[in-house]
């Protein structure tokens, strides 16, 4: 059975209905695919940091991470959010196992940008053997993007980048679950959805401000993963879970990201 990686961002997480998890469970039970969930937790991390009067800043959508910030991020994502997703799946009869990238050295990472962003890492290796064991045993892996590096140093990894690395390791499709139906642009006063964007078009829309903030690492990590063998990356609306089924059936939904222009996307 083919694997599909679902990245669920922190901004959309609390908006997802039980129907979203039911769709993923149906995909698993019908043999359509083996889902892997990689999640974020930005808004809840922000809230926790604010309560503790810890300042946080972002550079190109990446959170600058000190030891203090890392501890909070790990507590929120690997603890609260991860187990909430697992509970949501198990409450509808599914079987899920919540892990962070630290567990079993699931995600091995190195520090990004020579440490200029603090303890922010990028994944260099994925323990696919462990994930395959979980999936082959009927489970859905749920991964928090806290990774482990040399000397057991922990790193905060952007969730989109972590999901891209997992999809790359399995050479699978990557579905970026959002609360919008794709990349939207206002053209002549009308909002349109770009159903297909190439790398060149993405960079142009970043420069023009159409793609901004947290969407920047989302689309860039999706494009980067394509170079390494990810079958396809797409941004879909998780608030309308039928889009997931429609996409896997080959229908035109969301925004498909490709390296270059292709026909009949």
UniProtKB/Swiss-Prot annotation:
<keyword id="KW-0547">Nucleotide-binding</keyword>
<feature type="binding site">
    <location>
        <position position="156"/>
    </location>
    <ligand>
        <name>substrate</name>
    </ligand>
</feature>
<keyword id="KW-0028">Amino-acid biosynthesis</keyword>
<comment type="pathway">
    <text>Amino-acid biosynthesis; L-arginine biosynthesis; N(2)-acetyl-L-ornithine from L-glutamate: step 2/4.</text>
</comment>
<dbReference type="InterPro" id="IPR037528">
    <property type="entry name" value="ArgB"/>
</dbReference>
<keyword id="KW-0055">Arginine biosynthesis</keyword>
<dbReference type="InterPro" id="IPR001048">
    <property type="entry name" value="Asp/Glu/Uridylate_kinase"/>
</dbReference>
<keyword id="KW-0418">Kinase</keyword>
<dbReference type="GO" id="GO:0003991">
    <property type="term" value="F:acetylglutamate kinase activity"/>
</dbReference>
<dbReference type="GO" id="GO:0042450">
    <property type="term" value="P:arginine biosynthetic process via ornithine"/>
</dbReference>
<keyword id="KW-0067">ATP-binding</keyword>
<protein>
    <recommendedName>
        <fullName>Acetylglutamate kinase</fullName>
        <ecNumber>2.7.2.8</ecNumber>
    </recommendedName>
</protein>
<feature type="site" description="Transition state stabilizer">
    <location>
        <position position="218"/>
    </location>
</feature>
<dbReference type="GO" id="GO:0005737">
    <property type="term" value="C:cytoplasm"/>
</dbReference>
<feature type="binding site">
    <location>
        <begin position="41"/>
        <end position="42"/>
    </location>
    <ligand>
        <name>substrate</name>
    </ligand>
</feature>
<feature type="binding site">
    <location>
        <position position="63"/>
    </location>
    <ligand>
        <name>substrate</name>
    </ligand>
</feature>
<keyword id="KW-0963">Cytoplasm</keyword>
<keyword id="KW-0808">Transferase</keyword>
<comment type="similarity">
    <text>Belongs to the acetylglutamate kinase family. ArgB subfamily.</text>
</comment>
<feature type="site" description="Transition state stabilizer">
    <location>
        <position position="7"/>
    </location>
</feature>
<dbReference type="GO" id="GO:0005524">
    <property type="term" value="F:ATP binding"/>
</dbReference>
<dbReference type="Pfam" id="PF00696">
    <property type="entry name" value="AA_kinase"/>
</dbReference>
<dbReference type="GO" id="GO:0006526">
    <property type="term" value="P:L-arginine biosynthetic process"/>
</dbReference>
<dbReference type="InterPro" id="IPR036393">
    <property type="entry name" value="AceGlu_kinase-like_sf"/>
</dbReference>
<comment type="function">
    <text>Catalyzes the ATP-dependent phosphorylation of N-acetyl-L-glutamate.</text>
</comment>
<dbReference type="InterPro" id="IPR004662">
    <property type="entry name" value="AcgluKinase_fam"/>
</dbReference>
